[in-house]
Amino acid sequence: MTTRILTGITPTGTPHLGNYAGAIRPAILASRRSDVDSFYFLADYHALIKCDDPARIQRSRLEIAATWLAGGLDVERATFYRQSDIPEIPELTWLLTCVSAKGLLNRAHAYKAAVDRNVEAGEDPDAGVTMGLYSYPVLMAADILMFNAHKIPVGRDQVQHVEMARDIGQRFNHLFGNGREFFVLPEAVIEENVATLPGLDGRKMSKSYDNTIPLFSPSRQLKDAIARIVTDSRAPGEPKDPDSSHLFLLYSAFASAEQVAAFRQELLEGLAWGEAKQRLFQLLDNELGEARERYQALIAKPDDIEDILLAGAAKARRIATPFIAELREAVGLRSLREPLKSAESGKKKAAKAARLVSFRDDDGSFRFRLLDAAGEQLLLSRAFADGKAAGAVSKRLLAGETADLRAEGNAFGLWLDGEAVAQSPAFADAAARDAAIERTREALAPQE
């Protein structure tokens, strides 16, 4: 079976070593597998949320596209495109927006972080929050669901967005599928073994921290950047600790196992930091030299890159165009020449719309949510160590097994076999809590 994998990179700056080692290089390697169908795109609509400098976005799109190509991406095997060249994506975004619960989007980490910063500063909670930031998860859901990707390689900070895409896709399927599952529910793949590289100051390499090492900078600039890497004060001849060295982590991300072992031993034997930085420079200059030449040649011919991206968009639209037509048909955006269909024939009753949604939390544990017909959360399960345990509880609830709902202040808990397995959010008052308990009982009642 072929697995479809989808990855996007937001073009808001010059690609750096962290982008390459953490996302681009592993994606290119994965695209060469015969059992993988790869979709890689420049998330330039997402870039507009973070950047209001048109020249920077234009330049970054060119640089990131050239980086993928210089890194060895085979555009005959993979589908490589710009998000903004697929008009079906914003259309799908709107269709999904219309079934996305506000309560779901309120829980998005980026939005909550912005609100928390504003509250801490004594400002209006939504000060500076754009609808682009707020609805970012819906656009990401459209990116994923448009091509029915099975697996989405992400960092831990993006797992929630993939889970939200699952929720939104499941909601659309329920409302408009009429027996058909339009959307595959994607799975977040946390790449535990993919490098998260430190920057010049030891923090995660990020444009936000201004601590990056540009991927394809000329040799002189690369050497100067490496010279600025922060190290401890241990003198030449004094043993160094490789495992606490940012420089060693950078070296390890690009060296062979034999080179890493030799470098580790040299540090333990007291290799001077200046010499260690020279070793890192030589390694990177050798490893990236040929790709740097390809990159510079590509940058000099933007028309060629444009042609490649447009060809990739045409390839992607061969999937997107007929699919969006099916989705338009499903929601009722049909030709007036077609016979009218009754609302009951294409839609399930709202009373049956409550659902259990399983997901993997940021800490790696497994949970499930009970959502009502409007997508509002009624219950959040406790953390389970493995998916089978969480699934077993979900299965019992779906089978209509009687659960004990216990009021706890303005919230309530769900108990099975004398054990608390899920908890509600806090409600405004006891009346709201009791109404939610009744909705929960109805949601968990066996459907005839």
UniProtKB/Swiss-Prot annotation:
Its EC number is 6.1.1.2. A motif ('HIGH' region) lies at residues 11-19. ATP binds at T10, P11, T12, G18, N19, G155, R156, D157, L197, K204, M205, S206, K207, S208. A motif ('KMSKS' region) lies at residues 204-208. It holds the Pfam family tRNA-synt_1b. It catalyses: tRNA(Trp) + L-tryptophan + ATP = L-tryptophyl-tRNA(Trp) + AMP + diphosphate + H(+). GO terms for molecular function: ATP binding; tryptophan-tRNA ligase activity. Transmembrane segments: none annotated. PROSITE patterns: AA_TRNA_LIGASE_I (PS00178). Homodimer. Belongs to the class-I aminoacyl-tRNA synthetase family. This is Tryptophan--tRNA ligase.
